[in-house]
Amino acid sequence: MYAVFQSGGKQHRVSEGHVVRLEKLELATGSTVEFDSVLMIVNGEDIKIGTPVVTGAKVVAEVVSQGRGEKVKIVKFRRRKHSRKQQGHRQWFTEVKITGIQA
């Protein structure tokens, strides 16, 4: 059984026990979160596709950790002018473990 849900403008395909990195959620470590925007649920041959969401379905998860991702370097370079600009960015994330899918 797996489900596709939406969080932070992205869609995630998960099943029970998966650990997923999402955009940062303002939640404490160890707390429980429910995602109501479930787009699809597949249970063997039984497929439920939402229009746009499956009514009454939710994905339940537990917050494992909060953190920052790998550094992405941004470089702007102008030729022949000894001019360059360098910047780095680390995106915040929330790591959650899927504890249940309810249809």
Curated annotation (Swiss-Prot):
Keyword rRNA-binding appears in the UniProt entry: yes
Gene Ontology BP annotations: translation
Classification via SUPFAM superfamilies: L21p-like
Pfam hit, one: Ribosomal_L21p
Coiled coil segments of this chain: none
Keyword vocabulary terms for this entry: Ribonucleoprotein, Ribosomal protein, RNA-binding, rRNA-binding
A GO term, aspect molecular function: structural constituent of ribosome
InterPro entries, per the entry: bL21-like (IPR028909), bL21-like_sf (IPR036164), Ribosomal_bL21 (IPR001787), Ribosomal_bL21_CS (IPR018258)
GO cellular component: cytoplasm; ribonucleoprotein complex; ribosome
Function description: This protein binds to 23S rRNA in the presence of protein L20.
NCBIfam families referenced in this protein's UniProt entry, alphabetically: L21
Record's subunit section: Part of the 50S ribosomal subunit. Contacts protein L20.
Family: Belongs to the bacterial ribosomal protein bL21 family.
Protein's name in the database: Large ribosomal subunit protein bL21
Source organism: Histophilus somni (strain 2336) (Haemophilus somnus)
Gene: rplU
